[in-house]
């Protein structure tokens, strides 16, 4: 698959989608994107900057949602232009898609909406690549149906059918908890779509703090190492210079100062994993 001008797949180094959970300010976006661009370039990692102009799914109605679509897209467009980095953001309704598609390079679908057929069809017909998140309630093999919906919609619109990624972000495990079944990364490869592992939302504790979600950010390195050892096309991580002060998802955000060391480890592991190939592909023979 071609994504933002580069090839992605299990024969390539993982690409990185990263940034603050939500657009807090123009300066924060520029600072984080600039730092991530510098360290990913040094490590030979293709980088896509991520941030949300609106967080439609919040634990409390009083939680910060973001600057809104108009202001948020203005800031994201400035990051894209000034730093020359591709941009990913999530859309929440069909009505948002046309305007957002004019600004960003990649769209993302919220996990809770992966079964919404009309919504999936609409993003698939946007003309942009789409990172489709697997719902916390969905079995990994059921992502084939989601990807097939997107491909069918793209074909109807005369658009490329290979513009979709399948993203794992954990599975519900009782109340206020998620677990990551690493088998899902291998199973979702059967969709034929590049698989992305969301290492930060996978350590979220949804609603675990009452009016906000908790998280175990110390588990991000653990799960991201495991995912890279399994083999993924891409990684997704939210990061912030001061996670305790982040306005959204701070408990599961990677401290920005630790991103370089974490990525160095993951690159070394990725190189070994992909150099040696995937023996499991031969086990069914």
UniProtKB/Swiss-Prot annotation:
MF annotations from Gene Ontology: 3-deoxy-8-phosphooctulonate synthase activity
Cited InterPro entries: Aldolase_TIM, DAHP1/KDSA, KDO8P_synthase
Domain of life: Bacteria
Reactions catalysed: D-arabinose 5-phosphate + phosphoenolpyruvate + H2O = 3-deoxy-alpha-D-manno-2-octulosonate-8-phosphate + phosphate
Enzyme class: transferase
Pathway: Carbohydrate biosynthesis; 3-deoxy-D-manno-octulosonate biosynthesis; 3-deoxy-D-manno-octulosonate from D-ribulose 5-phosphate: step 2/3; Bacterial outer membrane biogenesis; lipopolysaccharide biosynthesis
Keyword GTP-binding: no
GO CC, alphabetical: cytoplasm
Sorted UniProt keywords: Cytoplasm, Lipopolysaccharide biosynthesis, Transferase
Entry EC number(s): 2.5.1.55
Subcellular location: Cytoplasm
Entry similarity comment: Belongs to the KdsA family.
HAMAP family reported in the protein's UniProt record: KDO8P_synth
Full protein name: 2-dehydro-3-deoxyphosphooctonate aldolase
UniProt lineage: Bacteria, Pseudomonadati, Pseudomonadota, Betaproteobacteria, Burkholderiales
Gene: kdsA
């Amino acid at each position: 698959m071609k994504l933002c001008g580069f090839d992605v797949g299990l024969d390539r180094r993982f690409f990185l989608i990263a940034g603050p959970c939500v657009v807090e300010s123009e300066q924060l976006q520029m600072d984080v994107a600039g730092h991530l661009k510098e360290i990913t370039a040094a490590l030979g990692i293709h980088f896509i900057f991520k941030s949300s102009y609106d967080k439609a799914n919040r634990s409390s109605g009083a939680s910060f949602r973001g600057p809104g679509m108009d202001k948020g897209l203005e800031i994201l467009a400035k990051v894209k232009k000034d730093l020359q980095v591709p941009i990913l953001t999530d859309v929440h309704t069909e009505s948002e898609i046309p305007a957002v598609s004019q600004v960003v390079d990649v769209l993302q679908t919220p996990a809770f909406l992966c079964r919404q057929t009309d919504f999936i069809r609409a993003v698939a017909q946007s003309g942009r690549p789409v990172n489709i998140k697997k719902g916390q309630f969905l079995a990994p093999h059921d992502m084939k149906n989601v990807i097939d919906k997107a491909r069918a919609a793209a074909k109807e619109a005369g658009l490329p059918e290979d513009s979709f990624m399948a993203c794992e972000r954990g599975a519900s495990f009782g109340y206020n908890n998620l677990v990551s079944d690493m088998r899902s990364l291998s199973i979702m490869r059967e969709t034929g779509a590049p698989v992305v592992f969301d290492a930060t939302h996978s350590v979220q504790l949804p609603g675990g703090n009452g009016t906000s979600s908790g998280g175990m950010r110390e588990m991000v390195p653990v799960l991201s190492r495991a995912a890279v050892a399994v083999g993924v096309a891409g990684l997704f991580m939210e990061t912030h210079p001061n996670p305790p002060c982040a306005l959204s998802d701070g408990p599961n955000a990677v401290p920005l100062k630790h991103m370089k060391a974490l990525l160095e480890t993951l690159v070394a592991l990725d190189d070994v994993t992909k150099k040696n190939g995937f023996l499991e592909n031969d086990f069914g023979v």
